[in-house]
């Protein structure tokens, strides 16, 4: 089975605490399961055949707060870099930090960096799980 790396990247970008993505190990089909706390878990293709699926990295696995810290050294303007570092240290959320990057005119650079990091994670995930992938 071969998976398209682009499909994994799309799943990573949509990732949130309530959406879990799974890959069918037999045919490469992607399944989406919504997990809302307090909701009864409905039967779905993943729960019906758990051995056929492998869970993609979750939002926690992707660790955007840590990833955004890795972006700071790439910021060219020392003043922006220092201000942004202070915002990180103040404990601002990723969405608040992204708004700051937008105000600084750097949000597209962040999204490009994030996508490159997602690509590395996707490749490693495929390799760790013995899944072939195409770029």
Language-model features: where?
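Intrinsic disorder and flexible coil segments
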Residues: 52-55, 93, 126
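Short, exposed beta-strand "edge-strand" segments with a Pro/Gly-rich flavor and a Y/T-containing core
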Residues: 1-3, 58, 88-89
């Amino acid at each position: 089975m071969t998976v398209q790396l682009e499909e994994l990247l799309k799943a990573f970008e949509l990732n949130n605490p309530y959406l879990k993505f799974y890959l069918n190990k037999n045919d490469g089909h992607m399944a989406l399961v919504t997990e809302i706390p307090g909701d009864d878990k409905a039967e779905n293709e993943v729960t019906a055949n758990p051995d056929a699926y492998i869970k993609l990295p979750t939002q926690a696995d992707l660790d955007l707060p840590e990833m955004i810290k890795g972006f700071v050294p790439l910021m060219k303007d020392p003043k922006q870099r220092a201000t942004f570092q202070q915002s990180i240290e103040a404990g601002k959320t990723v969405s608040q930090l992204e708004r700051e990057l937008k105000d600084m005119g750097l949000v597209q650079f962040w999204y490009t960096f994030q996508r490159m990091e997602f690509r590395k994670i996707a490749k490693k995930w495929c390799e760790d799980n013995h899944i072939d992938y195409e770029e």
